[in-house]
From Swiss-Prot:
GO terms for molecular function: rRNA binding; structural constituent of ribosome; tRNA binding. This is Large ribosomal subunit protein uL1. One of its GO terms (biological process) is regulation of translation. Part of the 50S ribosomal subunit. Binds directly to 23S rRNA. The L1 stalk is quite mobile in the ribosome, and is involved in E site tRNA release. The gene is rplA. Keywords: Repressor, Ribonucleoprotein, Ribosomal protein, RNA-binding, rRNA-binding, Translation regulation, tRNA-binding. Pfam families: Ribosomal_L1 (PF00687). It comes from Vibrio cholerae serotype O1 (strain ATCC 39541 / Classical Ogawa 395 / O395). Belongs to the universal ribosomal protein uL1 family. InterPro entries: Ribosom_uL1_bac-type, Ribosomal_uL1, Ribosomal_uL1-like, Ribosomal_uL1/biogenesis, Ribosomal_uL1_3-a/b-sand, Ribosomal_uL1_CS. NCBIfam families: rplA_bact (TIGR01169).
Length: 233
């Protein structure tokens, strides 16, 4: 096991791993522990009451956070005709078909999100081995394969996060930067949890959201008491 640095020992000493913190206390603790020399992201891990081995219990989707993620998102769109003009007007950095596919094949992928209209999937389908491993392959389940590419671009730019449970039934995503106001982080977390609960598989029984933990990029996880979140959650 790797030896913990003095900084990490100091950070971990501030967190009671047996306690679920009030959301405001949890956020304050994160900000106190964020001592890295860069602006750290605030990440969340949500343990779901699902059996991830069963395909009908897997959770996948996307939602727009009310205060965004704090990242400047570059968007590539595979489409043509009027949709291409609409995508450009919505702020997409790269728009095209075969020409855009050629850039991807050359390894020129200066973008964070890929969106495609249904008619463009014949082109995008050839790029699965490149885009797939990078988590960039468009998928209708997360709204990145859609006839309304302009709306998808706006959502991506506005701070849409995509989520998908891992093999242990845990969702990992980001809800902003440590420089966000406490209320902004709280509202982003609440928006994510509302979206997750709406996506609850009908076959999942019992408590759906079992545990919520937040952390900064270089910090320790802090468990959140869900009873201190908004009533809508």
């Amino acid at each position: 096991m790797a030896k913990l640095t003095k900084r990490m020992r100091t950070i971990r000493a501030k967190v009671d791993v047996t306690k679920e913190y009030d959301i405001n206390e949890a956020v304050a603790l994160l900000k106190e522990m964020a001592t890295a020399k860069f602006v750290e992201s605030v990440d969340v891990a949500v343990n779901l009451g699902i059996d991830a081995r069963k395909s009908d219990q897997n959770v996948r989707g996307a939602t727009v956070l009310p205060h965004g993620t704090g990242r400047d998102i570059r968007v590539a769109v595979f489409t043509q005709g009027a949709n291409a003009e609409a995508a450009k007007a919505a702020g997409a950095e790269l728009v095209g078909m075969e020409d855009l596919a050629d850039l991807v094949k050359k390894g020129e992928m200066n973008f964070d999100v890929v969106i495609a209209s249904p008619d463009a999937m014949r082109v995008v389908g050839q790029l699965g081995t490149i885009l797939g491993p990078r988590g960039l392959m468009p998928n209708p389940k997360v709204g990145t394969v859609t006839p309304n590419v302009a709306e998808a671009v706006k959502n991506a730019k506005a701070g849409q996060v995509r989520y998908r449970n891992d093999k242990n039934g845990i969702i990992h995503t980001t809800i902003g930067k440590v420089t966000f106001e406490a209320d902004q982080l709280k509202e982003n977390l609440e928006a994510l949890l509302v979206a997750l609960k709406k996506a609850k598989p009908s076959s999942a029984k019992g408590v759906f959201v079992k545990k919520v933990s937040i952390s900064t990029t270089m910090g320790a996880g802090v468990a959140v008491d869900q009873n201190t979140l908004s009533a809508q959650v």
